[in-house]
Curated annotation (Swiss-Prot):
Full protein name: Large ribosomal subunit protein eL20
Coiled coil start-end: none
InterPro entries with a match to the protein in the record: Ribosomal_eL20 (IPR028877), Ribosomal_eL20_dom (IPR023573)
Record text on subunit structure and interactions: Part of the 50S ribosomal subunit. Binds 23S rRNA.
Transmembrane regions listed in the UniProt entry: none
Length: 57
């Protein structure tokens, strides 16, 4: 499995806030899904409130 750096923004109470996180996943699509699931569970966000801008290996 490779390590991917996922960047993007999410909707916070005071506007959109940027983020950068590192995820270990077999491919880029799985890294995106893990990021959406992680932010959704940690911050109580829906997928429409998270915008992923890029996934880099």
């Amino acid at each position: 499995m490779s390590e991917y750096t996922v960047t993007g923004t999410f909707q916070a109470r005071d506007g959109w806030q940027s983020f950068e996180t590192e995820i270990e996943a077999p491919n880029e699509n799985v890294a995106e899904e893990h990021t959406l699931a992680e932010f959704g569970s940690q911050h109580g966000l829906k997928r429409t409130q998270i915008e992923i801008e890029g996934v880099d290996a």
